[in-house]
């Protein structure tokens, strides 16, 4: 049963400027595993913007509760390279409160726009 659906879009150029203007912003928004590829290279602005859109989409799928920590929602590749969503702490508590225990995630970026769609199920 679907608990919620969230969709978000991010302008990549604007997001990249924000990351440049505020050097610690990436650390506040993303875990180390999100900021770097498996080989240790920094992720592209497009990739980070899509992950940020996913975090926003998760919050929307949960009804946009307050007090969620950015690090409590992590988007990293699964062994096959597909984006995988893991929740912990504040986000996991909000998910339990709403009965969400299964996630579907889609990320995309093209033409300067990054987007994400999340479906939360029980």
UniProtKB/Swiss-Prot annotation:
Family annotation (InterPro entries): 4-PPantetheinyl_Trfase_dom (IPR008278), 4-PPantetheinyl_Trfase_dom_sf (IPR037143), ACPS (IPR002582), Ppantetheine-prot_Trfase_dom (IPR004568)
EC number annotated for this UniProt entry: 2.7.8.7
Cellular component per GO, a single term: cytoplasm
Binding site for Mg(2+): 8, 56
Chief location: cytoplasm
A Pfam family the protein falls into: ACPS
Subcellular location per the Swiss-Prot or TrEMBL entry: Cytoplasm
Gene3D superfamilies referenced in this protein's UniProt entry, alphabetically: 4'-phosphopantetheinyl transferase domain (3.90.470.20)
Keyword Lipid metabolism: yes
Keywords, in A-Z order: Cytoplasm, Fatty acid biosynthesis, Fatty acid metabolism, Lipid biosynthesis, Lipid metabolism, Magnesium, Metal-binding, Transferase
Alphabetical list of SUPFAM superfamilies matching this protein: 4'-phosphopantetheinyl transferase
Known function: Transfers the 4'-phosphopantetheine moiety from coenzyme A to a Ser of acyl-carrier-protein.
Protein name, as recorded: Holo-[acyl-carrier-protein] synthase
Species this protein is from: Salinispora tropica (strain ATCC BAA-916 / DSM 44818 / JCM 13857 / NBRC 105044 / CNB-440)
Taxonomic lineage: Bacteria, Bacillati, Actinomycetota, Actinomycetes, Micromonosporales
